[in-house]
């Protein structure tokens, strides 16, 4: 006897990409609903997910709260494509017998995006493209990366890749993180420091690669940002909430 078809709901597919993936074929025979926007309103989410048997979360934009889960009596599975689950109330899922599955994710895309942002900012690429389109030419000088210091805060899979990119560009790499991060960085031949202040004051480019949890939420404060060089670049391709609320506004104003 074959299993009954499920209703699978996939939110936050902004690029209308999932239907073109090879793995989407595995949902053949099931009813699939894909939403191409992101909403936060509880009533709207409850309506969209009301008869879902499974949610497939391809991003971490939609918060799966206890209040929402109580409105979803049919839901039995939440599948998250990446490893982050800070947006899912795991305890509420456990109470309601909802299984949560997470994927391994890939460090390659976020690492490459991080480096693209570093290059764009240090070489003023967006500004120069805009100027060129308006008839201008080389309106400012870029900043060379070779010989400058790349600070890596968190040496997991993504941080390790970004550190390697920095090395390839001739940068001095300085890693900060927990003991496990420091040991891995040392084994890979990178300098490391357990001193947060040294990282902040030394880095010309500081890249954050931390998981978001209770311990790391708001970890980077306005005081931390105030210790950085006025010419330094902060890159955060991890989670916005790693930085204390309003810190990015307060630090420049404080000088």
Predicted regions and their residues:
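N-terminal glycine-/charge-rich "phosphate-binding" loop or analogous flexible N-terminal tail
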Residues: 1-54, 58-59, 170
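Phosphate-coordination loops involved in phosphoryl transfer and adenosine-cofactor binding
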Residues: 5, 75, 146-149, 222, ...
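Short beta->alpha connector loops
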Residues: 13-16, 37-40, 59-63, 82-85, ...
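Structural motif corresponding to alpha-helix initiation and N-cap regions
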Residues: 17, 38-45, 61-66, 87, ...
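Short loop/helix-cap segments at secondary-structure boundaries that form the rim of catalytic
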Residues: 20-27, 70, 88-95, 180-188
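Rossmann-like adenosine-cofactor binding region
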Residues: 50-53, 63-68, 179-255
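Phosphate/diphosphate ligand-binding glycine-rich loop within oxidoreductases
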Residues: 51-129, 133, 142-143
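Glycine-rich NAD(P)-binding loop of Rossmann-like domains
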Residues: 128-161, 170
């Amino acid at each position: 006897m074959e299993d009954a078809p499920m209703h699978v709901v996939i939110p936050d597919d902004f690029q209308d990409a999932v239907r073109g993936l090879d793995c989407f074929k595995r949902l053949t025979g099931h009813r699939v609903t894909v939403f191409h926007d992101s909403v936060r309103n509880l009533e709207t989410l409850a309506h969209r997910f009301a008869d879902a048997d499974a949610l497939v979360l391809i991003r971490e934009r939609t918060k799966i709260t206890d209040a929402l889960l109580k409105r979803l009596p049919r839901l039995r599975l939440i599948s998250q494509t990446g490893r982050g689950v800070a947006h899912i109330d795991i305890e509420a899922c456990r109470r309601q017998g909802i299984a949560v599955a997470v994927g391994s994710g890939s460090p390659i895309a976020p690492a490459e995006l991080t480096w693209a942002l570093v290059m764009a900012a240090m070489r003023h690429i967006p500004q120069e493209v805009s100027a060129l389109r308006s008839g201008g030419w080389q309106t400012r000088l870029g900043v060379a990366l070779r010989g400058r210091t790349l600070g890596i805060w968190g040496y997991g899979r993504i941080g390790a890749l970004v550190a390697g990119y920095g090395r390839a560009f001739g940068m001095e790499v300085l890693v900060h993180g927990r003991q496990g991060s420091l040991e891995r960085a040392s084994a890979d031949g990178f300098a490391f420091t357990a001193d947060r202040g040294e990282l902040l004051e030394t880095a010309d480019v500081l890249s954050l690669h931390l998981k978001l949890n209770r311990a790391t939420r708001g970890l980077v404060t306005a005081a931390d940002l105030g210790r950085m060089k006025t010419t330094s670049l902060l890159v955060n391709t991890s989670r916005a909430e790693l930085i204390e609320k309003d810190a990015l506004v307060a630090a420049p104003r404080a000088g």
